[in-house]
């Protein structure tokens, strides 16, 4: 009979549950080590290696073939974000905030931080640039709401910094990503759509004062924006919510004094 000789004194239910536990432990180990292909080895906030690297070892390097002829990517690999960080410790122990040592918006630290992404445009599934200016995107137009093109752009100090000359759209997502603004000196900058408020007669940017618009990182091409440029632009404008706060407060104080 089955189970009398080979498994006469063995519980098959125990075999099943022990096998499941072994499989689950192996799955957890595999998923955790695969998750460590990016972001490891761990570092302190000043860039030095962290003392506690966790219980799992780094996985062996694996090479991925990138789509659209963009080469290969090996992770974990030798590539690292090796740029000077303009921050200084405020305490000896870890976990305390670091203080900027220069202009935090230009240095890209704190709320204005950016990640060293690839300096190439993001592509859609067909290998075309995802984000383009509307003047170069056939078939796109403002179908609803106020068209911001031609409107003046006002900073948080209530001063005019420039005017909107184009909208950059995400082709596959069919949504606006950036406003292209021409400054008073004739140069242009991109503003993230999430950081502007389109009003009936102007575009208001609460994050930046008018004198800070010239510091927005520029783009190399007038018809495309790279992943690195996107991150730098968004970091700079978002950082203004904190670093331009004194100018917003001074404007509010002046308005209150005027009506006092």
Swiss-Prot record:
It comes from the Bacteria. Binds 4 bacteriochlorophylls per trimer. GO terms for cellular component: plasma membrane light-harvesting complex; plasma membrane-derived chromatophore membrane. CDD domains: PRCH. The chain crosses the membrane at residues 12-31. Keywords: Bacteriochlorophyll, Chlorophyll, Chromophore, Electron transport, Membrane, Photosynthesis, Reaction center, Transmembrane, Transmembrane helix, Transport. It is found in: Cellular chromatophore membrane. Belongs to the reaction center PuhA family. This is Reaction center protein H chain. It comes from Cereibacter sphaeroides (Rhodobacter sphaeroides).
């Amino acid at each position: 009979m089955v189970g009398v000789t080979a498994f006469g004194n063995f519980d098959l239910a125990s075999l099943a549950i022990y096998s499941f536990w072994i499989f689950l432990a192996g799955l957890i180990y595999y998923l955790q080590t695969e998750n460590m292909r990016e972001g490891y080895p761990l570092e302190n906030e000043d860039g030095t290696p962290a003392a506690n690297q966790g219980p799992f070892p780094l996985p062996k390097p694996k090479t991925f073939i990138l789509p659209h002829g963009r080469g290969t990517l090996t992770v974990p690999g030798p590539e690292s974000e090796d740029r000077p960080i303009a921050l200084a410790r405020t305490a000896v122990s870890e976990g305390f905030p670091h203080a900027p040592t220069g202009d935090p918006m230009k240095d890209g630290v704190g709320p204005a931080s950016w990640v060293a992404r690839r300096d190439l445009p993001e592509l859609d599934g067909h290998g075309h640039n995802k984000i383009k200016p509307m003047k170069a995107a056939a078939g796109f137009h403002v179908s609803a709401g106020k068209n911001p093109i031609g409107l003046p752009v006002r900073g948080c100090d209530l001063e005019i910094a420039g005017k909107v000359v184009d909208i950059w759209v995400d082709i596959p997502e069919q949504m606006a990503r950036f406003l292209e603004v021409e400054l008073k000196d004739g140069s242009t900058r991109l503003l993230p759509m999430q950081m502007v408020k389109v009003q009936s007669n102007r575009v208001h940017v609460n994050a930046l004062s008018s004198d800070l618009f010239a510091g927005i990182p520029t783009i190399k091409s007038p018809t495309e924006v790279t992943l690195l440029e996107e991150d730098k632009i968004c970091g700079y404008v978002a950082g203004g919510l904190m670093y331009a706060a004194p100018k917003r407060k001074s404007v509010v104080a002046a308005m209150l004094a005027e009506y006092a």
